[in-house]
Amino acid sequence: MYKKYAELRDKRNITDYRVAADTGISTATLSNWKNGNYAPKFDKLLILAKYFDVPVEYFAEAE
């Protein structure tokens, strides 16, 4: 999932800090996803999907 997120973030040339500020998802949470400490909850995926204007299923597709 993080790889998909990172692709969207990088494509838009924004930082994790900007995503965190805009969505309310903390940079610590984003870091935990990156490091594989835990998977995102569905409500956070919905927030990211809306933020990046993609269907939530985008994050579930094979990487």
Where are these regions (language model features)?
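The alpha-helix within a helix-turn-helix
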Residues: 9, 20, 49
